Amino acid sequence: MKRTYQPHNRKRRNKHGFRSRMATKNGRKVLSARRAKGRHRLTVSSETSNKK
């Protein structure tokens, strides 16, 4: 039986990346909540950037 989680980095970036979060109002709400909480990584796309 094929399992539900079939990871692909491109799909991950496109769905949960910074640009897709900024594209919607609720996505921006997510980012601001994560900033307020003091998260080290805001999105999955910030994991491999130079900003670490």
Swiss-Prot record:
This is Large ribosomal subunit protein bL34. Keywords: Ribonucleoprotein, Ribosomal protein. Residues 43-52 have a biased composition (Polar residues). Belongs to the bacterial ribosomal protein bL34 family. Transmembrane segments: none annotated. The keyword Ribonucleoprotein applies. Residues 1-19, 26-42 have a biased composition (Basic residues). PROSITE patterns: RIBOSOMAL_L34 (PS00784). Gene3D superfamilies: 1.10.287.3980. It comes from the Bacteria. GO terms for cellular component: ribonucleoprotein complex; ribosome. GO terms for molecular function: structural constituent of ribosome. InterPro entries: Ribosomal_bL34, Ribosomal_bL34_CS. HAMAP family: Ribosomal_bL34 (MF_00391). GO terms for biological process: translation. It comes from Chloroherpeton thalassium (strain ATCC 35110 / GB-78). The gene is rpmH.
